[in-house]
Amino acid sequence: MRGAAPRVADLNLELNDLVLPINLLSEEVLQPSDDESEAPEEELFPFRIDTCCYRCEVNVRITLFAVEFGLRALEQLIVDGKLTFCCTTCARTLRNGR
């Protein structure tokens, strides 16, 4: 625009010269990558736990699916005594610490 007051006739609508066709830092071309689809997903393994209820000592069987790391972490919690299981009968009487 030129002049003290802007007018519609003074607007320059040709902006092609302002847009650069390439990146100034590099001329690399991004290849479409399918890394997400090519990366193998971790396999879920079925795992059965046979134990007893923490409160009434009745048999409890749990089947779960987890990745290998998840199974190892769960096993460590059980062995350390930081995780125990409860049967459905005892679970009905629990009130989440209330």
Swiss-Prot record:
Domain of life: Viruses
GO biological process entries: DNA-templated transcription; symbiont-mediated perturbation of host cell cycle G1/S transition checkpoint; symbiont-mediated suppression of host innate immune response; symbiont-mediated suppression of host type I interferon-mediated signaling pathway
Keyword entries, A-Z: Activator, DNA-binding, Early protein, G1/S host cell cycle checkpoint dysregulation by virus, Host cytoplasm, Host nucleus, Host-virus interaction, Inhibition of host innate immune response by virus, Inhibition of host interferon signaling pathway by virus, Interferon antiviral system evasion, Metal-binding, Modulation of host cell cycle by virus, Oncogene, Transcription, Transcription regulation, Viral immunoevasion, Zinc, Zinc-finger
InterPro entries: Papilloma_E7
GO molecular function: DNA binding; DNA-binding transcription factor activity; protein domain specific binding; zinc ion binding
Quaternary structure annotation from Swiss-Prot or TrEMBL: Homodimer. Homooligomer. Interacts with host RB1; this interaction induces dissociation of RB1-E2F1 complex thereby disrupting RB1 activity. Interacts with host EP300; this interaction represses EP300 transcriptional activity. Interacts with protein E2; this interaction inhibits E7 oncogenic activity. Interacts with host TMEM173/STING; this interaction impairs the ability of TMEM173/STING to sense cytosolic DNA and promote the production of type I interferon (IFN-alpha and IFN-beta).
Protein name listed in UniProt: Protein E7
Organism: Human papillomavirus 65
